[in-house]
């Protein structure tokens, strides 16, 4: 069984408890979502695509805060989509989809976002590239920074290994060649940092903005365990 099948089975098994396990009003993802909600008017966002919607929390909160916003979520796991439908979302608001191959044209959505998704994907740069392609104005990512997690010693060791570009090899050794870990709380997870895709996003955006969503020091790469990133491709000169 490969990791995609393992993750599929994990979500099917835990779908009924998904919200209780993963959604909390005081967690880092909701902190990031609150920030995004505050940027919608500033950026004059009229449409949003949410990649990896799960049961649709982001869709529901965006609709609640901005009723006239066009919001679409894609989620590959049917069991999670079904939970979303039972909570009031329609099949036109939450649809099947693959973040590595978004079935939309360039610029179809003003903003494309992903909350806690990329650390579940073996090649997250493919999803990020697709997000950048489909986004007309901006992308927003909320996810882990593995290099800012753990004790000071652990962070220093990981950052040193990464400095010499040996992190992929070290991670393979750590995971005994799999490249991922499986936990009851998160299913299949890869060692991921938002900073791994920083250069790709920087090249496609006019401005880039980073926010620590958990307590951290001034150097976010070194100290922040979780990061929100807003990449603005273009913005109106007088958005307000």
Give the ranges of each region predicted by the language model.
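Conserved beta-strand signature within the Rossmann-like core of class I S-adenosyl-L-methionine
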Residues: 136-144
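Conserved class I S-adenosyl-L-methionine
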Residues: 1-42, 44-54
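Short catalytic micro-motifs in class I SAM-dependent methyltransferases
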Residues: 116-117
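C-terminal alpha-helical "lid/dimerization" subdomain adjacent to the S-adenosyl-L-methionine
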Residues: 144-220
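A conserved beta-strand element that flanks and buttresses the S-adenosyl-L-methionine
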Residues: 113
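A short glycine-rich, Lys/Arg-flanked "PGG" loop and its adjoining helix->strand segment in the class I
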Residues: 125-137
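Class I SAM-dependent methyltransferase SAM/SAH-binding core
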Residues: 56-101
């Amino acid at each position: 069984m490969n990791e995609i099948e393992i993750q599929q089975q994990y979500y099917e098994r835990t779908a009924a408890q998904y919200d209780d396990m993963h959604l909390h009003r005081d967690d880092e993802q909701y902190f990031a979502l609150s920030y995004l909600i505050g940027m919608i008017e500033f950026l004059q966002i009229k449409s949003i695509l949410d990649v990896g919607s799960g049961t649709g929390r982001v869709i529901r909160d965006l609709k609640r805060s901005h009723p006239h916003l066009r919001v679409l979520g894609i989620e590959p796991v049917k069991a999670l989509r079904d939970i979303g439908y039972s909570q009031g979302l329609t099949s036109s608001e939450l649809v099947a989809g693959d973040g590595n191959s978004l079935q939309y044209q360039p610029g179809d959505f003003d903003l494309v976002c992903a909350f806690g998704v990329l650390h579940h994907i073996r090649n997250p740069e493919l999803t990020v590239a697709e997000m950048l392609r489909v986004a007309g104005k901006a992308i927003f990512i909320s996810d882990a920074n593995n290099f800012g997690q753990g004790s000071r010693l652990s962070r220093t060791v990981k950052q040193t290994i990464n400095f010499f570009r040996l992190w992929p090899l070290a991670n393979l050794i750590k995971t005994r060649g799999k490249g991922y870990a499986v936990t009851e709380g998160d299913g299949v997870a890869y060692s991921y940092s938002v900073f791994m895709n920083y250069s790709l996003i920087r090249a496609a955006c006019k401005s880039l903005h980073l926010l620590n969503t958990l307590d951290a020091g001034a150097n976010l790469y070194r100290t922040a365990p979780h990061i929100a990133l807003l990449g603005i491709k273009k913005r109106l000169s007088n958005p307000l």
